[in-house]
């Protein structure tokens, strides 16, 4: 029996990237310059001049009647109304996509106001929708920061997963002499790596294969996410590559607390089974105890001695991380409250040099509670109750030792 594949039915998952506003358009241009393959690029903006500089194959002017091509003036409500005016054009451009990345800079007018509208349209079309946005620098002012926070909150309601890049962290990872364009390229690399990584997962066949269905399982309706790629060579290559992939210094979240992880390892013919195990162990230890890891491996002879690790982690919830970190403390308190009091001070915790130099010395309120003796174990000396002495010993002391040695019964005779 012969089987045939109809390429007209499904030619693979369609991925589209739309940059909204000035920041989003710049990110798309840099991705095109980096020759990212397997995706379609779209740029949408209220500013006609910015659209003229776009390298995307599809450009959309947002709100031509409302803004007349002059931009949103840093007002998110203007960007929102412009996107609503151009909803039909956006819908036509996004239609047919299986996965849509929406990238924008938060805090301004067009990106902040229009990105949530674009995300809503993408979700209505049934596409897996991922937002990748930047939060402005603190020195850009509190008003811009407030606009960004509001825009991120609205966007999060309309996307499956969201990656937030903190511009403030650029100041921590780049040198003071680093040119501005190069610094912003570092932020755009987060988007580029995520898009390229997912595109490669879907299009490149693997020995243990991953497909778009796996990507959808990990990313659909999962909230905050982390995406990263790490490449390394040498003896500890898989360890170094995995740590790079899960440690993105620009993202506002970490893999700690992730519930779903898609892990793909690509290497040459010398890649071993134990290296795949090491990568999986590192990811599992960094995430939650019950993390679901979907593992894929690919052999690429062109990799040589290098190994590339791609990680997509989702379901990251800050409140879960807080509950997880506070749980051991509560358990310790419960255990200590049920334990029997121990008075052997040799078992006390050693005192550090800092505690020894403290004005409180080695006093510890936790030990104080434990070493305080119970009332029933205390022996009271008669001297403590002199005022209740019925024999009136203070008066008899002056009468001499002989009289003290005589019992009161005979002295009364």
UniProtKB/Swiss-Prot annotation:
GO CC terms: cell division site; cytoplasm
User: Predominant location of this chain?
Assistant: cytoplasm
Which InterPro entries did the record assign? Cell_div_FtsZ, Cell_div_FtsZ_CS, FtsZ/CetZ, FtsZ_C, Tub_FtsZ_C, Tubulin/FtsZ-like_C, Tubulin/FtsZ_2-layer-sand-dom, Tubulin/FtsZ_GTPase_sf
Q: What PROSITE patterns does its record include?
A: FTSZ_1 (PS01134), FTSZ_2 (PS01135)
- Which Pfam families does the record match to this protein? FtsZ_C (PF12327), Tubulin (PF00091)
What family does this belong to?
A: Belongs to the FtsZ family.
Write the protein's name.
Cell division protein FtsZ
The organism of origin for this protein:
Enterococcus hirae
Q: Which gene encodes it?
A: ftsZ
